[in-house]
From Swiss-Prot:
Lineage, opening ranks: Bacteria, Bacillati, Bacillota, Bacilli, Lactobacillales
Coiled-coil portions: none
Note: Gallate decarboxylase does not form a complex composed of Lpdc, LpdB and LpdD. The term subunit has been used in reference to the three-gene operon. Gallate decarboxylase LpdC is the only protein required to yield the gallate decarboxylase activity.
Binding-site positions, dimethylallyl phosphate: Y153, K169
Swiss-Prot/TrEMBL catalytic activity: dimethylallyl phosphate + FMNH2 = prenylated FMNH2 + phosphate
HAMAP family in UniProt: ubiX_pad
Name of the protein in question: Flavin prenyltransferase LpdB
Organism per entry: Lactiplantibacillus plantarum (strain ATCC BAA-793 / NCIMB 8826 / WCFS1) (Lactobacillus plantarum)
E.C. designation(s): 2.5.1.129
InterPro entries named among the record's database cross-references: Flavin_trans-like, Flavoprotein, UbiX-like
Any one GO molecular function term: flavin prenyltransferase activity
Residues at which FMN binds: G10, A11, S12, S37, S88, M89, K90, T91, R123
Function: Involved in tannin degradation. Flavin prenyltransferase that catalyzes the synthesis of the prenylated FMN cofactor (prenyl-FMN) for gallate decarboxylase LpdC. The prenyltransferase is metal-independent and links a dimethylallyl moiety from dimethylallyl monophosphate (DMAP) to the flavin N5 and C6 atoms of FMN.
EC top class, as a word: transferase
Disrupted-gene phenotype: Cells lacking this gene are unable to decarboxylate gallic acid and protocatechuic acid.
Length: 187
């Protein structure tokens, strides 16, 4: 059984988190631990038709963003890694500098110190030098940066097709077999 921590921040792009949680929920071999920031909850309302109750029902465990005593705040909580989707630049900066002022950044800090898989899905454009330096710092620490950049070789016909490709990339990072989207097979 894989155990994945999912952090959702207030950056736009909550649809990526919703899709990931839907696909993880379909897998009996994956346990999901979810934490959302206050702005993530607001964006869920603004950007999707999901209610908070519907979204949290997709997770096996949920935590409050200010609960620094939560299981996922400790290195002794064994898991296969964490994904932050979407990741705000505030959260990226906090993680890059070890500023664990909320449960998302604390859980990411623990993920780094325990040398577990950390996937960051940054949602910002354009990126400033500060953003790029913070993302580079995290990549040097072992985080995998997977920005939501669509592929077009698969001829997407809808926003959902674009989201599916991103979810495939995230699941691949955790070695979770999936056929969420069509893969490149050569020309």
């Amino acid at each position: 059984m894989k155990r994945i921590v999912v952090g959702i921040t207030g950056a736009s792009g909550t649809i990526y988190a919703v899709d990931l949680l839907e696909k993880l929920h379909q897998r009996p071999d994956v346990e999901v631990h979810l934490v959302m920031s206050a702005w993530a909850k607001k964006n869920l309302e603004l950007e999707t038709d999901y209610s908070l109750a519907q979204l949290t029902a997709l997770a096996d465990a949920t935590y409050r963003a200010n609960d620094q005593g939560a299981a996922i705040a400790s290195g002794s909580f064994l898991n296969d890694g964490m994904v932050i989707v979407p990741a705000s630049m505030k959260t990226v900066a906090g993680i890059a500098y070890g500023f664990g002022d909320n449960l998302i950044s604390r859980a990411a800090d623990v993920t780094i110190k325990e040398q577990r898989k950390l996937v960051i899905v940054p949602r910002e454009t354009p990126l400033s030098v500060i953003h790029l330096e913070n993302l580079t710092k995290l990549a040097k620490l072992g985080a995998q940066i997977i920005p939501p950049i669509p592929a077009f070789y698969n001829h997407p016909q809808s926003i959902q097709d674009l989201v599916n490709h991103q979810t495939m990339k995230i699941l691949d990072a955790f070695h979770i077999h999936n056929e969420t989207d069509r893969r490149w097979e050569g020309d």
